């Protein structure tokens, strides 16, 4: 028989039929697909929505969430049992059979994958198959860490008796499922208490120990709360202390504990692991934060000698998740004042202080009509609130708690269609009808996962050693915290670090050149000393896990003029989607192109809502305001942003990530830190890394003194030494595969078909048109890029080889190997492993194709060179450059030396080949806009490349060659070029052929536009004249004879492909200096009509400075021609981005001009100085 469930409100009983319990209707779900199992579910045709009213406001809602109820309600048809504490709950230990376990697991996994929008996905199916396999083999299974965190939060969200659930997502989960002993449990619980107490700024947390297997190896915490006061019962029946703890106090005494016999003796922790008999552990006094109670008005209140502990941590309940029963899973929130003032101190079966307080107040306690109990209770609550706030301890008053719960009900009704709530427990024990929850009808039902009552451990424990006289285990040796810590420290290094390793630190990077990855991996090494750290590229990160991260560190560079790197675009879009979901917008509303566009990121990098939390923000007052909590409210984060101040939108992507993480509720550990490529980037990271490590250790209450010293040494220590790196002979790898592995791209080998200088054979300048054979598997669209994998110059490679110490054959194929140490239960194990990125090839090939030898060495590499120098002057100079940021930047700017020039400047530096190779960074691809259209040149890819050569030291230094442009200049027809393509979706042609197009591209910025007009030509040839929108080109160069593709442009004008071509000449004699933005101003009316009135598209390609000037010019044109205010024109420009009508393809400084570099370096120095100030 299925009993009716009850909705209870002021004695009114509303019945409904619950769904069939999973326990009652277990089916064999083995070997079923998810779809088959859904068809197998019992029909729930009798279910109807529950109408719930608010008697005060007359508002009504329909609860449908109860359809998912999986447990019979406590009420009978003849009686309502809503006020019975354990009604309908089986407290006895029970092991679920496989079929029932699988049914629960199936339900939970459905909920989990639905929450991450992957219900019935291949990942869901694979996970379910894995669980089925585990259960079939072992009778149980393991939740993943992310599933566990999700389940713990959802269980709090489902708890019908909790009034503070609005903060359900802000729960720190300590995964302690690997603990096997009571001492390990005690260490974890001490960490939990320390973390959650947080010097009074209470934080919600749960610690989860191994789940039940066969019922004979349970882990249990015998205390009902982690911190509680003893109840000492005298022979006359009176109790000193807390009467609620008398029975458990006697258990502790029989185990050997001895209290002091005061009203507030803190009970020890009694713990049993793996079904063994319990041990007890005294909590160290410094771990238990107690608040002495005083009153703001009555001075005598403090004379009562009352106090209470700050942390309410429930430890006797069972966490039931996915069919797994976690019998030891203590959790905490923070106190509501009435829990202490009304219940703990006021209840007659607790401290029963109301009469004493009333007598002190000189109230007449002989008759209830004086309301002395009510008055005394109010003042007790006043004292509790006053005392907690006086000592800066988090607490919430019952009015604020009730208001927050009403907000939570509203949220849940919108998000889930209902909210389980037990009216008897939700309504505060004081001022009930003065709170809004009193008037709200509620539906009480139970959802999984959840927190469930279970039988007291001492009532069901099977003792291994029996003391016949007392019926308990013989007296145990008492364990002190210091003894445990000492034993852990000296007996097992692995176990000693296990506690900190339970806290995961996820480090994400987004990079184009590899610098962000390098800094991120160094950060990972530092955090591995105290956390379980993992380093991932943003594109490899599973965004479904972000809500459940405890610690998130981001190292992000900015690409171009504010864009994310290619491997960060998906992350940017996902963050934006979360933000839109939080704002209640439908999923289809989000614009992924907008989310990763430069203008959008620039705008969002300059805003910061007050709702985002700093670490120093306090919740010590009333915490009922839910507005500051977002979907990432449980995430602590810090961001290090890399960029170049040569670009106007400096570090825009890192700022964007920092702001969005904050706006989504994340807690910022330290303020955004930037590293400027123009000055002191490595130094900025070296300053930021130890700071964020120290703050993180403090946040998670990890002892960081000794660990901090070990970790920060990683910043200054050599990653490899002569004894930890070596070359071994090995067969050569395929070059194409090796390059693909290094760059994590599909690399193609493509022959060069043709090459010519667009300025003519006699010109002193060279801008090349390269025609490359296109592999049939390469696909691209006009506007996309090619990444060219160039070779370093032969003379550089030869020179470096001549400076190496060893006489290794540079043409023999070798493999670089690193000696790695791994700590195992058997001790430290050392193994030689291949370098994770470099291939097996010759030393010459490594220096030619795989390693960067032209970028000035970093301070870390110079410090390494100092250790290799035999001349004291070389050592001193190199050490100065490595440690003095200003000296390094001046040296770097003036000489911009390549590796060979450094070795020549410091000739006493002699380096082992393997050691040098291990220190160098990868040679990065050089990107070029494709200058052709596949619709016109089906088997070719064209590139437009300006050959870069310059002299350092104001033109008086040695000549330097651009790596890729000079490689392409030297390559001969028929030789193979290794390359890959990169999509540029924000720079593709409009979907509508009729939309006007304005193209602005001085110099080689014309490259992608050649592909545009070729595509339009092919379209017209294939489809006929048709109706095409105008296509106008604004091109600029220094002199008329440097006009690129002049004849081709004239031909396109005659063909009607190009509507107009405008030429700006900046150095032509006898005419005024003119730039492309000047011509835009001349054509302002036409530009306005095409862009604003006709909905045209605007494309800009070139260096970042030009692009910023063009953007400002277009903005001014639209404002002037449209008579717009600043606010209106800014909104219009952002709307163009939103509609993907403003397109930028931006690259950095083309030549190292003194004007640009001096300005950028000066701004970088000012920024560094400001960041170093406290």
UniProtKB/Swiss-Prot annotation:
Q: Where is the Flavodoxin-like domain?
A: 505-693
**KW RNA-binding (keyword) present:** no
Question: Which cofactors does the annotated protein need, by name?
Answer: heme b; FAD; FMN
Q: Which GO terms describe its biological process?
A: nitric oxide biosynthetic process
Could you confirm whether the keyword ATP-binding appears in this record? Answer: no
Record EC number? 1.14.13.39
Please list the residues that bind heme b. 162, 453
Binding annotation for (6R)-L-erythro-5,6,7,8-tetrahydrobiopterin: 83, 425, 438
- What note does UniProt attach to the cofactor annotation? Binds 1 FAD. Binds 1 FMN.
- This protein's superkingdom? Eukaryota
- Supply the alphabetized keyword list: Calmodulin-binding, FAD, Flavoprotein, FMN, Heme, Iron, Metal-binding, NADP, Oxidoreductase
Q: How is its activity regulated?
A: Stimulated by calcium/calmodulin.
Q: Which residues bind L-arginine?
A: 225, 334-335, 339, 344
Q: What region holds the FAD-binding FR-type domain?
A: 745-990
One GO MF term on file is: NADP binding
- InterPro entries cross-referenced by the UniProt entry: CysJ-like_FAD-binding, FAD-bd_FR_type, Flavdoxin-like, Flavodoxin/NO_synth, Flavoprot_Pyr_Nucl_cyt_Rdtase, Flavoprotein-like_sf, FNR_nucleotide-bd, NADPH_Cyt_P450_Rdtase_alpha
Chain residues that bind NADP(+): 998-1016, 1095-1110
Which reaction(s) are listed as its catalytic activity? 2 L-arginine + 3 NADPH + 4 O2 + H(+) = 2 L-citrulline + 2 nitric oxide + 3 NADP(+) + 4 H2O
The entry sums up its family as follows: Belongs to the NOS family.
Cross-referenced PANTHER family = NITRIC OXIDE SYNTHASE (PTHR43410:SF1), NITRIC OXIDE SYNTHASE OXYGENASE (PTHR43410)
Functional summary from the UniProt entry: Produces nitric oxide (NO) which is a messenger molecule with diverse functions throughout the body. The production of NO in the salivary gland is used as a vasodilator for blood sucking.
The identity of this protein, by name, is Nitric oxide synthase, salivary gland
Lineage here is: Eukaryota, Metazoa, Ecdysozoa, Arthropoda, Hexapoda
């Amino acid at each position: 028989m299925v009993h009716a469930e009850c909705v209870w409100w002021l004695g009114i009983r509303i019945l409904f039929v619950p769904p069939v319990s999973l326990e009652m209707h277990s089916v064999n779900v083995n070997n079923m697909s998810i779809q088959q199992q859904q068809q197998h579910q019992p029909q729930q045709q009798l279910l109807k929505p529950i109408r719930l009213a608010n008697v005060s406001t007359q508002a009504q809602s329909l609860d449908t969430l109860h359809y998912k109820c999986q447990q019979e309600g406590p009420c009978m048809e003849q009686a309502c049992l809503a006020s019975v504490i354990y009604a309908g709950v089986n407290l006895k230990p029970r092991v679920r059979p496989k079929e029932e376990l699988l049914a629960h697991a199936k339900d939970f996994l459905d909920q989990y994958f639905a929450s991450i929008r992957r219900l019935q996905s291949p990942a869901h199916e694979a996970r379910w198959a894995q669980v089925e396999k585990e259960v079939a083999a072992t009778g149980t299974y393991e939740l993943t860490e992310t599933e566990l965190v999700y389940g713990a939060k959802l269980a709090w969200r489902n708890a019908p008796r909790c009034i503070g659930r609005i903060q359900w997502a802000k729960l720190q989960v300590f995964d302690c499922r690997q603990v096997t002993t009571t001492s390990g449990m005690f260490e974890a619980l001490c960490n939990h208490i320390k973390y959650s107490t947080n010097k009074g700024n209470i934080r919600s947390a749960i610690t989860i120990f191994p789940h039940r297997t066969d019922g004979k190896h349970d882990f249990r915490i015998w205390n009902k709360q982690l911190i509680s006061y003893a109840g000492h019962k005298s022979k006359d029946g009176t109790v000193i202390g807390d009467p609620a703890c008398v029975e458990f106090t006697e258990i502790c005494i029989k185990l050997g504990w001895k209290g002091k016999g005061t009203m507030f003796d803190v009970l020890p922790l009694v713990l049993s692991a793996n079904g063994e008999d319990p041990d007890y552990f005294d909590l160290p006094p410094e771990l238990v934060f107690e608040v002495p109670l005083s009153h703001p008005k009555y001075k005598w209140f403090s004379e009562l000698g009352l106090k209470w502990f700050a942390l309410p941590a429930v430890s006797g309940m069972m966490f039931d998740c996915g069919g797994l029963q976690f019998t030891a899973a203590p959790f905490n929130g923070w106190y509501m004042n009435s829990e202490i003032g009304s219940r703990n101190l006021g209840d007659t079966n607790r401290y029963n202080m109301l009469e004493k307080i009333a007598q002190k107040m000189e109230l007449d306690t002989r008759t209830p009509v004086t309301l002395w109990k009510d008055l005394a209770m109010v003042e007790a609550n006043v004292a509790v609130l006053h005392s907690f706030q006086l000592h800066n301890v988090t607490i919430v008053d019952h009015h604020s708690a009730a208001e927050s719960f009403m907000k939570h009900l509203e949220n849940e009704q919108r998000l889930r269609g209902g909210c389980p709530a037990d009216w008897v427990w939700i309504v505060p024990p004081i001022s009930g009808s003065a709170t809004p929850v009193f008037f709200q009808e509620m539906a009480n039902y139970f959802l999984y996962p959840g927190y469930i009552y279970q039988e007291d451990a001492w009532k069901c424990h099977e003792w291994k050693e029996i003391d016949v006289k007392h019926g308990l285990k013989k007296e145990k040796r008492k364990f002190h915290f210091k003894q445990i810590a000492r034993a852990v420290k000296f007996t097992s290094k692995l176990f000693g670090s296990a506690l900190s390793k339970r806290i995961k630190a996820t480090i994400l990077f987004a990079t184009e050149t590899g610098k962000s990855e390098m800094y991120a991996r160094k950060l990972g090494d530092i955090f591995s000393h105290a956390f379980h750290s993992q380093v991932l590229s943003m594109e490899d990160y599973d965004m479904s896990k972000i809500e459940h991260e405890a610690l998130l560190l981001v190292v992000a560079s900015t690409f171009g003029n504010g864009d994310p790197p290619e491997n960060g675009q998906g992350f940017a879009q996902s963050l934006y989607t979360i933000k839109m979901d939080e704002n209640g917008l439908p999923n289809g509303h989000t614009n992924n192109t907008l989310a990763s566009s430069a203008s959008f990121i620039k705008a969002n990098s300059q805003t910061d809502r007050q709702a985002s939390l700093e670490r120093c923000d306090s919740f010590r007052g009333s915490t009922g305001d839910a507005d500051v909590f977002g979907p990432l409210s449980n995430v602590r984060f810090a961001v290090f942003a890399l960029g170049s101040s040569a670009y106007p939108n400096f570090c825009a992507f890192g700022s964007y990530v920092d702001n969005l993480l904050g706006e989504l509720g994340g807690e910022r550990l330290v303020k955004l830190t930037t590293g400027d490529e123009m000055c002191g980037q490595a130094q900025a990271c070296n300053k930021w890394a130890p700071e964020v490590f120290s703050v993180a250790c403090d946040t998670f209450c990890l002892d960081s003194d000794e660990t901090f010293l070990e970790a920060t040494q990683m910043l200054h220590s050599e990653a490899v030494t002569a004894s930890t790196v070596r070359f071994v002979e090995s067969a050569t790898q395929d070059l194409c595969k090796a390059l693909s592995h290094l760059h994590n791209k599909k690399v193609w080998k493509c022959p060069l078909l043709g090459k010519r200088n667009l300025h003519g054979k006699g010109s002193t300048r060279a801008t090349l048109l390269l025609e490359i054979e296109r592999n049939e598997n390469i696909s691209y669209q006009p506007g996309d890029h090619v990444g060219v994998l160039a070779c370093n110059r032969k003379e550089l490679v030869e020179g470096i080889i001549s400076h190496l110490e060893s006489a290794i054959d540079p043409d023999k194929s070798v493999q670089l190997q690193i000696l790695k140490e791994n700590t195992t239960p058997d001790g430290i194990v050392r193994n030689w492993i291949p370098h994770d990125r470099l291939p097996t090839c010759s030393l010459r090939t490594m220096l030619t194709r795989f390693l960067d030898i032209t970028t000035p060495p970093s301070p870390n590499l110079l410090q390494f060179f100092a250790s290799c120098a035999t001349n004291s002057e070389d050592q001193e100079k190199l050490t100065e450059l490595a440690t003095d940021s200003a000296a390094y930047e001046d040296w770097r700017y003036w000489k911009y030396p390549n590796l060979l020039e450094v070795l020549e400047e410091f000739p006493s530096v002699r380096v082992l080949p393997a050691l040098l190779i291990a220190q160098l960074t990868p040679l990065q691809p050089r990107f070029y806009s494709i200058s052709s259209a596949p619709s016109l040149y089906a088997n070719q890819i064209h590139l437009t490349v300006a050959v870069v050569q310059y002299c350092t030291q104001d033109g008086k230094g040695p000549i330097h060659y651009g790596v890729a442009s000079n490689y392409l200049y030297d390559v001969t027809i028929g030789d193979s070029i290794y390359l890959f393509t990169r999509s540029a979706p924000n720079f593709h042609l409009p979907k509508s052929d009729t939309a006007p197009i304005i193209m602005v591209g001085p110099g080689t910025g014309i490259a992608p536009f050649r592909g545009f007009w070729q595509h339009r030509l092919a379209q017209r040839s294939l489809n006929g004249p048709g109706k095409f929108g105008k296509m106008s080109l604004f091109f600029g160069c220094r002199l008329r004879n440097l006009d690129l593709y002049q004849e081709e442009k004239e031909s396109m004008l005659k063909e009607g492909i190009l509507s107009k071509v405008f030429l700006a000449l900046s150095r032509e004699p006898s005419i005024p200096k003119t730039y492309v933005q000047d011509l835009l101003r001349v054509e302002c009316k036409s530009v306005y009509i095409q862009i604003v009135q006709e909905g045209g598209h605007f494309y800009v390609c070139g260096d970042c400075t030009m692009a910023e000037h063009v953007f400002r010019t277009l903005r001014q044109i639209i404002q002037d021609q449209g008579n717009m205010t600043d606010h209106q024109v800014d909104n219009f420009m952002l709307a163009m981005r939103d509609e993907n009508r403003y397109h930028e393809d931006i690259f950095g400084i083309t030549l190292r001009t003194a004007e640009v570099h001096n300005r950028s370096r000066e701004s970088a120095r000012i920024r560094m100085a400001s960041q170093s100030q406290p």
